[in-house]
A protein has these predicted regions:
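Conserved active-site motif detector
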Residues: 1-120
Length: 120
């Protein structure tokens, strides 16, 4: 059965130019699923939520994580609080738009949905 999802937020990927996007650019496309991780050690933003791309190296089987950037500071407080409360599994984050010709802050847009908690 397909999980029910509720639209929560659409935003740009902040800080993209400072992180690992270029290493995996060719693997990213509209619909790519990303992971949201609370970054408690971020000295620039007390509510920092990292956006991470995970892939498995086909040769070694090792899971590799690439920090792509962050949820913008003006958009992250509720997500940060829910992640701190252990609700990381309720979020589905996917790339909704890629524009390589745009300014860094506008190259990647994200759609975040809340996945309904289906009880057995």
């Amino acid at each position: 059965m397909k999980a029910k999802k509720l639209f929560f937020k659409e935003c740009h990927l902040a800080g993209r130019q400072y992180h690992d996007v270029d290493e995996v650019w060719d693997e990213l496309h509209v619909g790519t699923q990303l992971e949201l991780q609370r970054d408690l050690d971020n000295r620039h933003d007390k509510n920092a939520v990292a956006v991470v791309y995970r892939t498995v190296d086909v040769d070694t089987g090792i899971v590799e994580e690439y920090l792509l950037g962050y949820i913008p500071g003006e958009e992250n407080e509720t997500i940060a609080q829910l992640l701190e409360m252990g609700w990381e599994d309720i979020f589905e984050c996917r790339i909704s738009k890629i524009n390589p010709d745009a300014h860094y802050e506008n190259q990647i847009r994200l759609t975040i949905k809340i996945v309904k908690n289906e009880k057995d």
